[in-house]
Amino acid sequence: MNIRPLHDRVVVRRKEEEEKSAGGIVLPGSAKEKPNQGEVVAVGSGRVLDNGETRPVDVKVGDTVVFGKYAGSDTIEINGEELVILSESDIKAIIE
């Protein structure tokens, strides 16, 4: 996949949506919540600071991350796969 996000942007592939609820009920498409976890597939070079230096992002390709519920409104489709473009500040945690 060839995508290179700019600055402190991160491209994430969302985790698969749950097909069933915790109680075993099959969820229709409209009842499913978009997952707020995913795998990092590309990272930008980092944030440019006021002094001109670039601070690299803290995540790397392959990391599994948790992001805010309302983050990820910027989505793109590449090769039939939906990807989310986030700012690094939208990422809440790295799952190790």
Swiss-Prot record:
SUPFAM superfamilies: GroES-like. Signal peptide: none annotated. It comes from the Bacteria. GO terms for cellular component: cytoplasm. One of its GO terms (molecular function) is metal ion binding. The keyword Cytoplasm applies. Pfam families: Cpn10 (PF00166). It is found in: Cytoplasm. CDD domains: cpn10. The keyword Protease does not apply. HAMAP family: CH10. Together with the chaperonin GroEL, plays an essential role in assisting protein folding. The GroEL-GroES system forms a nano-cage that allows encapsulation of the non-native substrate proteins and provides a physical environment optimized to promote and accelerate protein folding. GroES binds to the apical surface of the GroEL ring, thereby capping the opening of the GroEL channel. Belongs to the GroES chaperonin family. This is Co-chaperonin GroES. It comes from Teredinibacter turnerae (strain ATCC 39867 / T7901). The lineage of its organism: Bacteria, Pseudomonadati, Pseudomonadota, Gammaproteobacteria, Cellvibrionales. The gene is groES.
